């Protein structure tokens, strides 16, 4: 069984036991978070599509890590004008371990 869950403005396909990197959440390492914006539930014999969300469905996940992605370097350059600008960006993320998927009855 799998579900498509929305968090941080993005959609992720998850199943029990999977690890997923999502946009940074305000939670400490070891905390459990509940993701209740479930868009789709896929079972072996049926698919439940939410309008926009599946009522009563939620995903319980554990925060494994709060970290940053590797640095992305941005370099701006204008020829003949001696204009150069270099800066970097590291996007923070939260790594979740999916513990349980709760479905409506």
Curated annotation (Swiss-Prot):
Coiled coil: none annotated. This is Large ribosomal subunit protein bL21. Keywords: Ribonucleoprotein, Ribosomal protein, RNA-binding, rRNA-binding. The lineage of its organism: Bacteria, Pseudomonadati, Dictyoglomota, Dictyoglomia, Dictyoglomales. The keyword Amino-acid biosynthesis does not apply. Belongs to the bacterial ribosomal protein bL21 family. The gene is rplU. It comes from Dictyoglomus turgidum (strain DSM 6724 / Z-1310). One of its GO terms (biological process) is translation. GO terms for cellular component: cytoplasm; ribonucleoprotein complex; ribosome. InterPro entries: bL21-like, bL21-like_sf, Ribosomal_bL21, Ribosomal_bL21_CS. GO terms for molecular function: rRNA binding; structural constituent of ribosome. This protein binds to 23S rRNA in the presence of protein L20. Part of the 50S ribosomal subunit. Contacts protein L20.
